[in-house]
Amino acid sequence: MSCQQNQQQCQPPPSCPSPKCPPKSPAQCLPPPSSDCALSSGGCGPSSESGCCLSHHRHFRSHQCRRQRSNSCDRGSGQQGGGSCRGHGSGGCC
């Protein structure tokens, strides 16, 4: 009888950590970023660290765009569009 109890106690642990781990991670990760993103409405700069939707990609693009815009636009490569070239570009900027 003692053996059966020991075997049963060994089987439940491996079954618990598997299902308990996956749901806990995504559940806790989904709510915080979703709330921050919705509140920011696409302009979550400091929230990107928390894992905002596309804020991280946008933040990075903004940095590269600023640098490229200064280099490309200054040279006259994207001066044609002026303010329009900001959103109209093959690389995201000019």
Swiss-Prot record:
Source organism superkingdom: Eukaryota
Tissue: Skin-specific. Expression was readily detected in adult trunk skin, adult arm skin, fetal skin, penal skin, vulva, esophagus and tongue. Not expressed in the cervix, rectum, lung, colon, or placenta.
Pfam families, per database record: LCE
GO annotation, biological process: defense response to Gram-negative bacterium; defense response to Gram-positive bacterium; keratinization; killing of cells of another organism
Low complexity composition bias: residue spans: 1-10
Region (Disordered): 1-35, 65-94
Signal peptide from the UniProt entry: none
UniProt biased composition (Gly residues): 78-94
Compositional bias ranges of the Pro residues kind: 11-34
Keywords attached to this entry: Antimicrobial, Keratinization
InterPro entries in the cross-refs: LCE
Function: A structural component of the cornified envelope of the stratum corneum involved in innate cutaneous host defense. Possesses defensin-like antimicrobial activity against a broad spectrum of Gram-positive and Gram-negative bacteria, both aerobic and anaerobic species. Upon inflammation, may regulate skin barrier repair by shaping cutaneous microbiota composition and immune response to bacterial antigens.
Subunit structure: Interacts with CYSRT1; the interaction is direct.
Membership in a protein family: Belongs to the LCE family.
This protein's name: Late cornified envelope protein 3C
